[in-house]
């Protein structure tokens, strides 16, 4: 696209010529103007126009103003002094000398008009000097600009017609002369290409003023430069016409200089932007092609995948290091080739951004011109897509390599790897290389080490069951003055039965911090010796105070054990056998209750206490053989010990790394969600609902009267006047409780939690109201000898119903519905609340019998169970077959990761 092809039809606008011709010389236009002025009798006005054009160095041809190329830019122009190039930069003395020379020339024009007219017509066509020079210098030459990338269509040709307007004589006289002034409008920032193609010829004084307003809109100021003032002689001239000629000539020079100066600056910016865009396009093509070739060569030459990744990473580093120097080097070349005024470019914000280069880049960069050759659009897109795919693969591989190095570093140093877990978790969530996660199988895996750990914990549960059932057979012989050396009043007897739940409350509160700081195994192990001491205090008691001290110490250990035993078992046993082995503590606890009832038939309270002191001995020995839980080791940052504990529990041939990493991720989530004050965390609205459900289930479990029935079984049967021996009745109740444990384990995952709670409530309500009716008839004097079997039957059904629902389910749902971040503190609160209710029931049961009779106490327990039925219907959710994430989403409205939460099996004897 050449400048000659885009010249347009502006040359024939005023004279009626067709478009597309070359611009006519100024002499032809002046000739036509002379003819019109001569016919109008204004020959003198023509000479004034001609003299002003000569004085202002306008030139002889419009081609000097609009050269061949529509985008003029100086090419290899000699560098001129700023004062010569821009008149407004000259000193006042130089300007005064220049104006004096112009005045002298104007005075000689009247004498040399014929010669000037002839010289004007014969003068050859010359290129216009952009700015007026006092010295003779070679004219500026022009070259075509680089085509802009975004100019794909031929520019629109703008026809600017010459406006020739013949002014009236009055206007001619007022202006002093008629001037032809070439004023191409400066290009605006919005449409630079269109502005460079516009051409116009301004005629007359009115068009001159209009051009001034246009230039003012283009940010060109017509204010006088500092130091420039009209000569005093011209201001004081008496000749008005001469003064007007001088003023208009001076303004013409200034307007022409400012106009071309603005055009030059805009053209320099346009050229720099054009070259920059072309270079960037070539740079991207070169980068993609070089990257694709290099990666293909790597795939062929690499002997292994690791070597390929290493070489590719080195290439990526070299590519990014060379990118900035290459761009900076090329842009410097472009700016040097298109810049003629470094001072003005330094002030421009856009050029400052382009010229900027990092300080640390000092070495030269060699650019291969062959690599900068452009290819077709299809090849360019294909190469870029291939390169982007390879780069994405490289990035993923680097992340995988980094993750592998982090794991290896943790294995060698043995430090706490939890600091790296957030990074690992983020990589996993983003869909990047995932770590192997332990997934339980459906087939049960029985390993003798896990069975040994379950048996050791279950022996501690047997001790707890024996201590819970001790008061039922022991109070019968303890209140007998023939068998006891001290007197035990009914009030003291109630304290013997009720002080253990009160101590269990304190133990439940203290058990939470103990298992966190001492460890699960150490906390359980620490209860063995206090158990033995408590039983010896009871066995050797010489007064009621020693018995109460022994019961309080035993109750404190029971409270700690009831919290720590299920936690240890849940954290050591695999999920595949957790249900089966989790049954052992409940079964051994019921065995302890049955053993206490059977031994109490043949032993007094002192001998029974010596038997209780012997039970913790095997429990103590076995606890020394088992390790601490791996989860507690992970929480303390002891990764190597956690690995050894897993190897002991899972077997030497088992791969424990996936499970160990899962424990570390779960612990990291718990640490991130933990707060400094966990008790305040319980009071949040989102945590109150699950906590209130757990506390409600504990409340209805204990207010059903189960502990009162267990503690006072023999006394109840004696008061009922049953034909069956009281000790035999307690044995029967213990056997039923033991058998109901297996039935509940089978049905709890098949029928559902709420269904078993419904059945349990109905059975307990019916039996409690029937027992209340039996005692009411007996207290009324009615003969009940014919129904002596009724109390035993009601007790059996009552124990069976309790063991099916309200015995195990409150403990089970405590581990299901409590949020992960508050499970420890919330479980401690629930356990303490359970023992508080147990203390209230056992301590006040004897007082309730004295106050409202046995029938009133059983009817009150039945009414509470009936209310608990509606609590279960409207408030307790069903958790059967749901993951912990689904349960928490329903309870709190959000999901958290709970990948390894122990399925805690309750101790049904802890009632």
Swiss-Prot record:
**Where in the sequence does UniProt note compositional bias of the Low complexity kind?**
51-64, 76-129, 156-166
Stretches for region Disordered: 1-256, 334-355, 380-402
Localization, per the record, is: Cell membrane
Task: Kindly list the GO molecular function terms attached to this UniProt entry.
Answer: sugar transmembrane transporter activity; trehalose transmembrane transporter activity
Question: Per its UniProt record, what InterPro entries does this chain match?
Answer: MFS_dom (IPR020846), MFS_ERD6/Tret1-like (IPR044775), MFS_sugar_transport-like (IPR005828), MFS_trans_sf (IPR036259), MFS_Trehalose_Transporter (IPR050549), Sugar/inositol_transpt (IPR003663), Sugar_transporter_CS (IPR005829)
Q: Which domain of life is it from?
A: Eukaryota
Major place of residence: membrane
**Presence of the UniProt keyword Thylakoid in the record:** no
The record lists glycosylation at 482
- State the protein's purpose: Low-capacity facilitative transporter for trehalose. Does not transport maltose, sucrose or lactose. Mediates the bidirectional transfer of trehalose. Responsible for the transport of trehalose synthesized in the fat body and the incorporation of trehalose into other tissues that require a carbon source, thereby regulating trehalose levels in the hemolymph.
Q: State the family it belongs to.
A: Belongs to the major facilitator superfamily. Sugar transporter (TC 2.A.1.1) family. Trehalose transporter subfamily.
Protein's UniProt name? Facilitated trehalose transporter Tret1
